[in-house]
């Protein structure tokens, strides 16, 4: 004990500095890992569309706006995606106000995301004109649905199967979705909620 208490100030400063550096390196590694996972996830999702928008705000028609995690341009039209990264067993249904997540001893609920998805689809439809607009709530592979998936909900791994990327366009003519998609692009703006819900590794 005496040896520790008698250490010179310079030694204490070096110890403190090493601790700060260690904490900083640990934080940087976690940040880098999370960023790498996020980038891989975004790449997997956006690969489904021929074009995409990520983390944008769309006008709601009443002076405000909705945050959109993803909007994909597909051969079927535009697809609004609400990304959910939760771990554990998810119990949800079309008529339930709240969905429950059970992860070992941990249990929590979140508001049924279907109604907010409908609002976002309607907002994009108001801009897209004749372009069909669909929506899905996408869960990462960390989630499981023991009692089945609710309506408009799918797992990330099945996204490409549900929306196969086929070369669009009318043979010998322009793609009828070019103008509606450009209208969507022109109407949205970057969202301040970008990265607000980090994706865990």
Which residues make up each language-model segment?
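Amphipathic, interface-forming alpha-helical segments with heptad-repeat character
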Residues: 85-100
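Surface-exposed interaction regions that form or flank ligand-binding interfaces
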Residues: 1-66, 73-78, 87-89, 103-201
